[in-house]
Amino acid sequence: MRGWRQWWAICAMAMLLALAGCASTGKQMSALERAQYTWSAAIRWGDFEGAWNLVDPEYREAHPMSELQFERYKQVQVSHYRDLASSPGESEALREIEIGVINRHTMAERTMRYTEHWRYDAAKQAWWISNGLPDFWAGE
């Protein structure tokens, strides 16, 4: 009888530990979803300076944005922002996006694809986009 109780106690402890691990992973995924929603809202509404605050601080330091570069983003309007595919991981995630971009001066619209690279910073408990703002002028 005593062996049976010990076995149940060990199983109960194992399940509690497993649930605790799931809870932390769940919180991390929930934080990723919130960060991605905040990012996509900033891009959709043309708040590129706000979106810049969600870019990995190491990337921002290595690739600072000038006022002229931010002004260039004011020349476009985002018409749509669609999540095509995503592959979340424990500390990194990828998301393939389709973005509709309208040139405010010519009113010409075009569609582009952009891959978001996300990185989890355990020290700050935050997800950061690690590849900067979308380059609407790639190849121009």
Regions found by a protein language model. Name each.
Residues 28-44:
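Short, aromatic-enriched amphipathic alpha-helices that serve as compact interaction elements
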Residues 33-34, 48-94, 107:
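Short solvent-exposed beta->alpha transition segments
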Residues 1-11:
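Bacterial N-terminal signal peptides that target proteins for export
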